[in-house]
Amino acid sequence: MARPDTVIPDKPESPYPIVQDSVVVSGFGRGSSELGIPTANIPINDDLNQLETGIYYGWCQLKPCTLPDECKTRTNGREVIYNHGKNLRNDDLKVLPMVMSIGWNPFYHLKEKAAEVHIMHKFDDFFYGAQIKFNVLGYIRPELDYTTKEALIEDINLDIKIALEALDRDAYQTYKDL
C-alpha cells in the first residue's frame, strides 16, 4: 500500500481530543538503536485499542515517580532499569509534541499490538516507569509495511514534519495545556 495523502484539519475533529494517562514501559529496543527515533512505549488500553491502527499526533508530558529503581527484562532478554523518570530535567518535563504509532508494525512482524510514542525532544537518559499524560489530536495515516528500514525512517520523519506543522497551528496550540 502506498502512503496516502495526508490532510490535517484546521482544528481537531471528533473523536479528538482523546486524553490519556499512562506509564512508560520498555519496548523492543529498536526505536533508538535501529532507527535513531526513540519511542516511549505505553500499554494498550481499551481506548487506544479501539483506534484504527496508524500514526497519530498530539501533545504529551512526562512526570517522574518516586518509586525505587528496578531492573526488568525485555522480551528480547535484555535488562533495562526502570528509574521512573527521576533523571528527567526541567526541559524534559515541559509539554512536548509527539507522534504515536498504534498497531502491529508490519515491518517488524509484531505478534501483539503496540503503542509507541515518539516525543519530539532530545532526552539525556531513559525514563522507563515515568508517568506520561498525552492527548491525541488527529490521525496522519494508516500503518504501512516497508521493504527497507530506510523507507520506514523516511516515512517516520515525514510524520514528524506533518505533526509539527499541525501542532504549530493556533487551534492545536490550545490543547497544549494538559
UniProtKB/Swiss-Prot annotation:
<keyword id="KW-0862">Zinc</keyword>
<dbReference type="InterPro" id="IPR023468">
    <property type="entry name" value="Riboflavin_kinase"/>
</dbReference>
<keyword id="KW-0547">Nucleotide-binding</keyword>
<dbReference type="GO" id="GO:0046872">
    <property type="term" value="F:metal ion binding"/>
</dbReference>
<dbReference type="GO" id="GO:0005739">
    <property type="term" value="C:mitochondrion"/>
</dbReference>
<keyword id="KW-0418">Kinase</keyword>
<comment type="pathway">
    <text>Cofactor biosynthesis; FMN biosynthesis; FMN from riboflavin (ATP route): step 1/1.</text>
</comment>
<keyword id="KW-0067">ATP-binding</keyword>
<keyword id="KW-0460">Magnesium</keyword>
<dbReference type="GO" id="GO:0008531">
    <property type="term" value="F:riboflavin kinase activity"/>
</dbReference>
<comment type="function">
    <text>Catalyzes the phosphorylation of riboflavin (vitamin B2) to form flavin mononucleotide (FMN) coenzyme.</text>
</comment>
<feature type="binding site">
    <location>
        <position position="39"/>
    </location>
    <ligand>
        <name>Mg(2+)</name>
    </ligand>
</feature>
<dbReference type="GO" id="GO:0009398">
    <property type="term" value="P:FMN biosynthetic process"/>
</dbReference>
<feature type="binding site">
    <location>
        <position position="41"/>
    </location>
    <ligand>
        <name>Mg(2+)</name>
    </ligand>
</feature>
<feature type="active site" description="Nucleophile">
    <location>
        <position position="116"/>
    </location>
</feature>
<keyword id="KW-0285">Flavoprotein</keyword>
<keyword id="KW-0808">Transferase</keyword>
<dbReference type="Pfam" id="PF01687">
    <property type="entry name" value="Flavokinase"/>
</dbReference>
<protein>
    <recommendedName>
        <fullName>Riboflavin kinase</fullName>
        <ecNumber>2.7.1.26</ecNumber>
    </recommendedName>
</protein>
<dbReference type="InterPro" id="IPR023465">
    <property type="entry name" value="Riboflavin_kinase_dom_sf"/>
</dbReference>
<comment type="similarity">
    <text>Belongs to the flavokinase family.</text>
</comment>
<dbReference type="GO" id="GO:0005524">
    <property type="term" value="F:ATP binding"/>
</dbReference>
<keyword id="KW-0479">Metal-binding</keyword>
<dbReference type="GO" id="GO:0009231">
    <property type="term" value="P:riboflavin biosynthetic process"/>
</dbReference>
<dbReference type="InterPro" id="IPR015865">
    <property type="entry name" value="Riboflavin_kinase_bac/euk"/>
</dbReference>
<keyword id="KW-0288">FMN</keyword>
